[in-house]
A protein has these predicted regions:
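Amphipathic protein-protein interaction modules
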Residues: 49-86
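Charged, alpha-helix-enriched surfaces in structured cytosolic catalytic cores
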Residues: 19, 41, 79-83
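Amphipathic alpha-helical binding modules
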Residues: 74-105
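General structural signal for secondary-structure boundaries
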Residues: 13, 41-42, 68, 98, ...
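Short terminal alpha-helical segments
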Residues: 1-36
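Short, contiguous, helix-prone interaction/anchoring segments in small proteins
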Residues: 30-60
Length: 105
């Protein structure tokens, strides 16, 4: 229970958001997605990118980000790409949180 609280607290920190943004950009580069995200509105930018990617490129990106396929089923159908972008950002944030938590131990 404490871990969930610590994760939610971390999401609010500006430095944590910047680290999450950097992790997302790193994974976009690894997937060879040439797209510029802006820290202020990277959720909207990511949603637009996902919508414009080919299905092959999108699958490659999701694989590199390590987003479990079961998460795809819980993305709301009303705006699929916004929901998928949120799932990606949560996954990237979790990577940053775990890296910070275990690198300090």
């Amino acid at each position: 229970m404490l871990e969930k609280f610590a994760y939610k607290e971390a999401l609010l920190a500006a430095d944590f958001r910047l680290q999450t943004f950097a992790q997302l950009q790193k994974d976009l580069e690894r997937a060879q997605c040439e797209f510029t995200l802006h820290p202020a509105n990277f959720l909207d930018d990511l949603s637009k990118l996902l919508e414009n990617l080919s299905s092959e490129k999108r699958a490659q990106l999701l694989y590199l980000i390590d987003l479990p396929e079961k998460n795809d089923a819980i993305v709301p159908t009303s705006n699929y790409y916004d929901g998928l972008a949120e799932q990606i950002i949560h996954r990237e944030a979790l990577k940053v949180f775990l890296r910070n938590k275990f690198s300090s131990q």
